[in-house]
């Protein structure tokens, strides 16, 4: 798998699939599978049996992973999906920069 371009707590927009256009926060990144879990995106219904943790059981809704290639970083300043570039500042810190407007993430 190639390196995943988003990190936990990034705001992303889905660019393809049934949830195209939805904006959400990355809850977790699965680098070995090349997938990410985004809040309120790709929500699946699961029928849960009662167990020790969940005595009630029933139908639960949870986010399922989607491929990282289906999401792009969302820039709040541009209000659109954008590609990013990496830049090293004078003090040696590495920052991610929006290719459209130059805003740092």
From Swiss-Prot:
- Give the matching Gene3D superfamilies: 2.30.30.30
User: CDD domains, from UniProt?
Assistant: KOW_RPL26 (cd06089)
Q: Which SUPFAM superfamilies match?
A: Translation proteins SH3-like domain (SSF50104)
Taxonomy, superkingdom? Bacteria
User: Which InterPro entries does UniProt cross-reference here?
Assistant: KOW, Rib_uL2_dom2, Ribosomal_uL24, Ribosomal_uL24_KOW, Translation_prot_SH3-like_sf
Summarize the protein's role. Answer: One of two assembly initiator proteins, it binds directly to the 5'-end of the 23S rRNA, where it nucleates assembly of the 50S subunit. One of the proteins that surrounds the polypeptide exit tunnel on the outside of the subunit.
SUBUNIT field? Part of the 50S ribosomal subunit.
Protein family membership: Belongs to the universal ribosomal protein uL24 family.
What name has this protein been given in UniProt? Large ribosomal subunit protein uL24
What gene name does this entry carry? rplX
């Amino acid at each position: 798998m190639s390196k995943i371009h988003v990190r936990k707590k990034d705001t992303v927009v889905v660019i393809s699939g049934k949830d195209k256009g939805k904006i959400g926060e990355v809850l977790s990144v699965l680098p070995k599978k090349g997938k990410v879990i985004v809040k309120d995106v790709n929500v699946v219904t699961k029928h849960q049996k009662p167990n020790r943790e969940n005595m009630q059981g029933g139908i639960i809704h949870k986010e399922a992973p989607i491929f990282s290639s289906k999401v792009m970083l969302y820039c709040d300043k541009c209000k659109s999906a954008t590609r990013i570039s990496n830049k090293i500042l004078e003090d040696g810190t590495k920052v991610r920069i929006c290719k459209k407007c130059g805003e740092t993430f």
